[in-house]
């Protein structure tokens, strides 16, 4: 036994020093996201967070998500700065549609070989997303797993917890015939449909870094971070009686809008109320994608759809546009027993 080489964890492909260096790199940006309810600092076995005292009957709302194969595109193009924003956005946008205020966020970062610069870039993006949504980044897990991922490839997952007053939960149960539907413009494909995006790029033979669309590289359009609607929507909820909110993610219009509709109602979308952003027109043309498939796969320029009573619509539009959103009336709710829950005409 004495003549054998002494092995270390680093020999097995796990660099603890690199992990410690990453923690030192991110401490500053993580601290900026802190909320007054958070107790303790980074590095504990668990993160502690008190409930905000303003809630009389608080209900916790939780969510988890990733960014799908947008991550593959980001890795191929070596652009990691916005992926963290995407990760937070996918989680907090899901929470706020139920009326919840995001409280804290945790991330999971897994890789075959830890590149401190890449990981720090991703986590800086996560911190930025948390700042945009008023959410505290309270911890995470960085897992270096040689043999599980190819080289420095990585994957990320996010976990978020928010809180809503029990009496103010938004669940779509009050959606009624005559309600107006308001759209919030998206920043691009957000974090959905990227397996099809990558297939279209492959089939078309274009280089996303040199192919120009509206004067900038296609890559810029495709890697534009997912818009975070939290602060705008929370202010809307405080001032307007909102009946339902749908976050248009995987499944697009056909699958996400029905998730907030009661039985015997139908969302009628006016397709002429907006123009698809150029990236969606390019994807449809380059991939010869059908209209139905576009609306099933992509948000086509609409990040959220909000249902509220008709008399509240103008007030809601004014507030949302004042907050910097691109908001417009996109449709109405009709009474219907049809199996087709969404009609786009």
UniProtKB/Swiss-Prot annotation:
GO terms for molecular function: ATP binding; phosphoribosylamine-glycine ligase activity; phosphoribosylformylglycinamidine cyclo-ligase activity. Keywords: ATP-binding, Cytoplasm, Ligase, Nucleotide-binding, Purine biosynthesis. It is found in: Cytoplasm. InterPro entries: PurM-like_C_dom, PurM-like_C_sf, PurM-like_N, PurM-like_N_sf, PurM_cligase. Pfam families: AIRS, AIRS_C. GO terms for cellular component: cytosol. One of its GO terms (biological process) is 'de novo' IMP biosynthetic process. Pathway: Purine metabolism; IMP biosynthesis via de novo pathway; 5-amino-1-(5-phospho-D-ribosyl)imidazole from N(2)-formyl-N(1)-(5-phospho-D-ribosyl)glycinamide: step 2/2. SUPFAM superfamilies: PurM C-terminal domain-like (SSF56042), PurM N-terminal domain-like (SSF55326). Its EC number is 6.3.3.1. It catalyses: 2-formamido-N(1)-(5-O-phospho-beta-D-ribosyl)acetamidine + ATP = 5-amino-1-(5-phospho-beta-D-ribosyl)imidazole + ADP + phosphate + H(+). Belongs to the AIR synthase family. PANTHER family: TRIFUNCTIONAL PURINE BIOSYNTHETIC PROTEIN ADENOSINE-3 (PTHR10520:SF12), TRIFUNCTIONAL PURINE BIOSYNTHETIC PROTEIN ADENOSINE-3-RELATED (PTHR10520). This is Phosphoribosylformylglycinamidine cyclo-ligase.
């Amino acid at each position: 036994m004495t003549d054998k080489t002494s092995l270390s964890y680093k020999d097995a492909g796990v660099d603890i020093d690199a992990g410690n260096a990453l923690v030192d790199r991110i401490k500053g940006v993580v601290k900026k996201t802190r909320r007054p309810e958070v107790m303790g600092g980074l590095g504990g076995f668990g993160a502690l967070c008190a409930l905000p005292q303003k809630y009389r009957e608080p209900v916790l709302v939780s969510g988890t998500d990733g960014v799908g194969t947008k991550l593959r595109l980001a890795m191929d193009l070596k652009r990691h700065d916005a992926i963290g924003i995407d990760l937070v956005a996918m989680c907090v946008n899901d929470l706020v549609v139920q009326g919840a205020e995001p409280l804290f966020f945790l991330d999971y970062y897994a890789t075959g070989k830890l590149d401190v610069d890449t990981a720090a870039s991703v986590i800086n993006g996560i911190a930025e997303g948390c700042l945009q949504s008023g959410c505290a980044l309270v911890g995470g897990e960085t897992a270096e797993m040689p043999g599980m991922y190819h080289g420095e490839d990585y994957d990320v997952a996010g976990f978020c917890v928010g809180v809503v007053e029990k009496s103010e939960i938004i669940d779509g149960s009050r959606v009624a015939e005559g309600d107006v539907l308001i759209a919030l413009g998206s920043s691009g494909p957000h974090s959905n449909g990227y397996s099809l995006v990558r297939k279209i790029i492959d089939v078309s033979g274009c280089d996303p870094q040199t192919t120009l669309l509206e004067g900038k590289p296609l890559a810029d359009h495709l890697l534009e971070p997912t818009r975070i609607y939290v602060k705008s929507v929370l202010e809307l909820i405080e001032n307007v009686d909102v009946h339902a909110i749908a976050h248009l993610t995987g499944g697009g219009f056909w699958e996400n809008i029905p998730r907030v509709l009661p039985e015997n109602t139908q969302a009628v979308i006016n397709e002429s109320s907006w123009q698809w952003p150029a990236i969606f027109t390019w994807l449809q043309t380059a991939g010869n994608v059908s209209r139905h498939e576009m609306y099933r796969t992509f948000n086509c320029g609409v990040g959220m759809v909000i249902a509220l009573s008709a008399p509240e619509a103008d007030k809601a539009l004014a507030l949302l546009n004042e907050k910097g959103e691109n908001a417009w009336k996109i449709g109405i709710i009709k009474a219907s027993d049809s199996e087709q829950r969404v009609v786009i005409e």
